[in-house]
Amino acid sequence: MPQLNPGPWFAILVFSWLIFLTIIPTKILSHISPNEPTPVSAEKHKTESWDWPW
């Protein structure tokens, strides 16, 4: 019975967890924060308030 041989199944299990723990978290984190944080010294855009003409 080849199902009782743990060799190939253990390798598949280890390889699949290796993929889950290395590749997938990086993809999830890239979707959670897609933009790099701006440094503190970056200039802020000066926006002026605009009123409706009525």
Swiss-Prot record:
One of its GO terms (cellular component) is proton-transporting ATP synthase complex. It comes from the Eukaryota. Residues 35-54 are annotated as: Disordered. It is found in: Mitochondrion membrane. Its main location: mitochondrion. The keyword Coiled coil does not apply. The chain crosses the membrane at residues 4-24. One of its GO terms (biological process) is proton motive force-driven ATP synthesis. Pfam families: ATP-synt_8. Keywords: ATP synthesis, CF(0), Hydrogen ion transport, Ion transport, Membrane, Mitochondrion, Transmembrane, Transmembrane helix, Transport. Residues 42-54 have a biased composition (Basic and acidic residues). InterPro entries: ATP8_metazoa, ATPase_protein_8. It is a single-pass membrane protein. GO terms for molecular function: proton transmembrane transporter activity. Belongs to the ATPase protein 8 family. Subunit 8, of the mitochondrial membrane ATP synthase complex (F(1)F(0) ATP synthase or Complex V) that produces ATP from ADP in the presence of a proton gradient across the membrane which is generated by electron transport complexes of the respiratory chain. ATP synthase complex consist of a soluble F(1) head domain - the catalytic core - and a membrane F(1) domain - the membrane proton channel. These two domains are linked by a central stalk rotating inside the F(1) region and a stationary peripheral stalk. Component of the ATP synthase complex composed at least of ATP5F1A/subunit alpha, ATP5F1B/subunit beta, ATP5MC1/subunit c (homooctomer), MT-ATP6/subunit a, MT-ATP8/subunit 8, ATP5ME/subunit e, ATP5MF/subunit f, ATP5MG/subunit g, ATP5MK/subunit k, ATP5MJ/subunit j, ATP5F1C/subunit gamma, ATP5F1D/subunit delta, ATP5F1E/subunit epsilon, ATP5PF/subunit F6, ATP5PB/subunit b, ATP5PD/subunit d, ATP5PO/subunit OSCP. This is ATP synthase F(0) complex subunit 8. It comes from Cyprinus carpio.
